[in-house]
Amino acid sequence: MLNEQLQKKVSQSIKLLQSVQKRYDGEIEIAYSGGKDSDVILQLAKEAGIRYRAIYKNTTIDPPGTLGHVREMGVEILRAKTSFFHLVAQKGFPSRFSRFCCEKLKEYKVLDKSIIGVRKAESRKRNEIYNEPTKCRYYGAKKEENHVEQIYPILEWTDEDVRDFIIDRKLKLAPIYYDSGGANRRIETSGMYVLSSRLKAQAHYRVPEISQDSKGLSPCCAAIYGHAS
């Protein structure tokens, strides 16, 4: 059973989603990453009774079992025209200042409104950047056709809030959150950021002309592989 404070947050999240739907007739995208926060916002959308289209943008470097979980959750899978390894072959590894991997594989418009599982508690930077439960964003040039309203229903949720909600609603998570015996071992974080070095090695194997001395993945690509949200 949820504590009173978390129950209030759940109610506020649901009201936010419903308020967006009241002023918008179309379907709202759920930016589904396969991570625990995505499963939470998907559940909230169901409880809110809104019209949504849950979409997983396949980055071509998905953690084992992720695509199976995405399909099991009934989420639509979109595939980019290129792959991460093709981009690396063309441009080398992305960096903090060159985020072409996210731009090509993950950050593009599908619908006019998008629900995202961003939380302030995830990092100090996110706590500084995200101040409101909704935000307007442009993908590409600042033109009306590129405009998206992003909605953050769990922006103020803590790691404990997410954990308790998952337990209370008995949500099934992606395989990466469980050990070999089926016990939930990583309900607070998938911990997949530690695999960025393995991904780098895989990229070097598949694209041998890339130097071993490459400084590695940008945070955005580590996040793609890590499914933190």
Task: Label each residue range with its predicted role.
Residues 1-229:
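Nucleotide-activated chemistry modules centered on ATP-dependent adenylation/adenylyltransferase
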